[in-house]
Amino acid sequence: MTQKRIIKLAFCLLTSIAGIGAYLYACGWFPPDWYVTNSAFSPEVTVPKGVYNSLFYSVEQSFNGYVGIDSDRYTEDDLADWCAYVGKAMPREQIRHLMYDGEAIDEVLQLKHSKKFTDKRVQNFLTFLEITRGNEVITGGSYYDPWDYENRNYQRLQNTEPQRVEALYRSLTSDAFFANRIWFQAVRLKFYSENRSSVIPFFEETAASQPKNSLYYRAMHYVAGAYIAEKHYPQANVLLAEIFDTTPELRTTVGYDYRPLPDREIAQIAQKLSPGVQCALWAMQGFYTNNEANYLLKILTIDRQSPHVEFLLTRFINKMEYKLNVFDRYGDDLKSIKAYHQHARKVSTQVFSTDWLLLLAREGNRFSNPYLWKVAGGYVA
């Protein structure tokens, strides 16, 4: 049987029971996740570490408790880049100190206007720091209490500051590394400015001349944020899908930024995208729609090697497991093994359909994570 026919058959097996499952879900009572459920299927073991962590299934809270703002995500990478650029002209620990220590901003300004460092690359580094550290009160959000939702008053940069940085970027012609960093700061400052939407045309005009490194996709994330602020969700979702597909370290963040739309709109949007970005788009759509199996199968029809099926498959298994473990969760007496097997049979045939999974598990070697498919198939068998 060909791969396409197998996936098509899996679709049929899934949809044949969809009505029953939807009815039981709509009429059932799903209590808050106040109790910890023991799991025999740990997604962080079967899926590459850190790639989808907070997108794994949890009923009332994020997987592993919460999602923090990982402000240190790029700290070491950015430090390494600047150390390589500056070379031996400035010690590594001084570079780290100037980039990240809270009280270093005054020192940056003093060094910038002194004659201690005459090396051109060090001067560029100090110019970069003058921009980033000089505006971090606003770009870093340190001026408000993140837990005070009632009295949050966002500050914005005056338009003159991003315009100044943009002018500096446009004047740079010979130093690609420095120009790329200043370009990113221009994008960033426009996002935090009084004219946030100005980041969109600037990115569209200049992005093609930039290397597609982490700064490129971080800049794209700001543009997606500007579209979200304008409620232009289709445009935002396209950018978020590209980031989700290309930048694993941002998948959790963009997954939460995504705004689900009706499937017909997503299908229209997806037609113009590359297969990888289409898969990412459907993966995020599946995260929000409570029907992981359907979107998982959509992805497999586009690219059977797509890694984005992985967190959807783990969510499907963990949701089913949550229904199976009612005895464990609430301390209900398990009157007999037979009663448990009857309950498990009902969950796996009426509340959830698993025939499609068993079918695809036999073909697991053809997918991106054969181990996950075999373990999932064995779990529901």
Predicted regions and their residues:
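Bacterial N-terminal signal peptides that target proteins for export
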Residues: 2-10
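Bacterial N-terminal signal peptides
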Residues: 10-19
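Extracytoplasmic/secretory-pathway proteins
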Residues: 22-188, 193-381
